[in-house]
Amino acid sequence: MARTYKGGCLCGHIRFEAEGPALKPHTCSCTMCQHHSGALTLHWVEFPADKVRWSAKPSVWRSSDYSSRSFCPKCGSTLGAIDDKPVVALVLGSFDSANRRELAPEYHSHAGKRPKWMAR
């Protein structure tokens, strides 16, 4: 049975439901993720686009030739990335409950961009 994950932005204007399984849970420290979020590392989880339902349409900014970063138009909360291929990557910090074993990162992208003083 597929699990449903719920979350949303800081102000509550945008809520989402994503039907699992959660795919490719990972962390990333690339410059784009750092600038998008203001954090040194982001935790991502991917879902097929047709398995993600939004209560309101997030704002997007075209960040590359294959993806757009999504955020709340009212409070600016980072929500994730909407790829041209049918994938939506959501940031785990926007989930209502992130304390699930299946959401633990399986790998880290761009580990070389992580500050040396940052705990592993």
What residues fall within each predicted segment?
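A short Gly-Trp-Pro
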Residues: 1-8, 13-120
